[in-house]
UniProtKB/Swiss-Prot annotation:
Interacts with IscS. This is Sulfur carrier protein TusA. It comes from Salmonella typhimurium (strain LT2 / SGSC1412 / ATCC 700720). Belongs to the sulfur carrier protein TusA family. The active site is at C19 (cysteine persulfide intermediate).
């Protein structure tokens, strides 16, 4: 799974930010991306383990991978539309 994180199109460093800031930054970043591009999100807020997958489901983007066993958390999403 780690290989998926090695070459994202965009990276968002949300370390030190707390809910709702990380998901708001993800939304703003995704809005400026092209369909099919990937975004690596790096975060340390425990709420992101719920919020990032929920955002992807609600906005119908693809959550390609997530690592939440230890800090920092990493998520890889692909913009679907």
């Amino acid at each position: 799974m780690s290989d998926l994180f090695s070459s994202p199109d965009h990276t968002l460093d949300a370390l030190g930010l707390r809910c709702p800031e990380p998901v708001m930054m993800v939304r703003k970043t995704v809005r400026n991306m092209q369909t099919g591009e990937t975004l690596l999100i790096i975060a340390d807020d425990p709420a992101t383990t719920r919020d990032i997958p929920g955002f992807c489901t609600f906005m119908e983007h693809d959550l390609l991978a997530q690592e939440t066993e230890g800090l920092p958390y990493r998520y890889l999403l692909r913009k679907a539309h």
